Regions:
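Short phosphate-coordinating micro-motif centered on Lys-Gly-acidic
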Residues: 1, 86-91, 97-156
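N-terminal pre-Walker A segment at the start of P-loop NTPase domains
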Residues: 1-17
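Phosphate-binding P-loop
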Residues: 18-25
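The conserved Walker
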Residues: 34
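Conserved lysine of the Walker
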Residues: 38
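Short beta-strand-centered segment that lines the nucleotide-binding/catalytic pocket of NTP-utilizing
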Residues: 51-66
Length: 156
C-alpha cells in the first residue's frame, strides 16, 4: 500500500491509525533517511494509545520503553533507533530478546543495522521525502502485518 502524506499532521494520523489496529506482539520496521518522519509516526502511534509525554528518538539509548495502562488493557511498547548500533550483537548484550516478548509491540528505526539479529518484521514502513511532503509504503509480511495493511487501506 502506498500513500502520500502532505504534512506532519498526516504522518501523525497514520501513526494513530496504525496504533488503533496494531495487535500485541507486532514488530514494525521503520525505514527512511534522517528526518523522513519515522519518529513523528511513532509519536502519533504512542499518543493515540494514551501516552502524554514527549516522544524522542532513542538515538543514544537505542531503545525507549513505554508502558501504557488503560482502563481495560496494559501494553508495553518499545521504540528502537538503531542508527548508532555498530554491531547487531550489541542488542543481545542489552537484553534485546526480552523486548521482543509475545505481547509487546516493537517499533524499530534503522532495522538494517540489526539485520541478522532482529526478528522478522510483521510490517515494514518506508518513508521517503518528496518536495511537497512524504511518500509512505507499507508492506505486510505476517498475517498480522497483512491484516494491518488491509485495515489501513480502508481508513486512509
Amino acid at each position: 500500500m502506498e500513500r502520500f502524506l502532505a504534512n506532519e499532521a498526516a504522518t501523525l494520523e497514520l501513526g494513530a491509525q496504525l496504533a488503533q489496529h496494531c495487535p500485541a506482539g507486532c514488530v514494525i520496521y521503520l525505514h527512511g533517511d534522517l528526518g523522513a518522519g519515522k519518529t513523528t509516526l511513532v509519536r502519533g502511534f504512542l499518543h493515540a494509545l494514551g501516552h502524554v509525554g514527549a516522544v524522542k528518538s532513542p538515538t543514544y539509548t537505542l531503545v525507549e520503553p513505554y508502558s501504557l495502562v488503560g482502563p481495560e488493557t496494559s501494553q508495553s511498547i518499545y521504540h528502537f533507533d538503531l542508527y548508532r548500533l555498530s554491531d547487531p550483537e550489541e542488542l543481545e548484550y542489552l537484553g534485546g530478546r526480552d523486548y521482543f516478548a509475545a505481547q509487546s509491540i516493537c517499533l524499530v528505526e534503522w532495522p538494517e543495522r540489526g539485520e541478522g539479529w532482529l526478528p522478522r518484521a510483521d510490517l515494514d514502513i518506508y518513508l521517503q521525502h518528496r518536495a511537497d511532503g512524504r511518500q509512505v509504503r507499507l508492506l505486510g509480511h505476517s498475517q498480522a502485518g497483512l491484516t494491518l495493511v488491509e485495515q489501513l487501506k480502508r481508513l486512509l
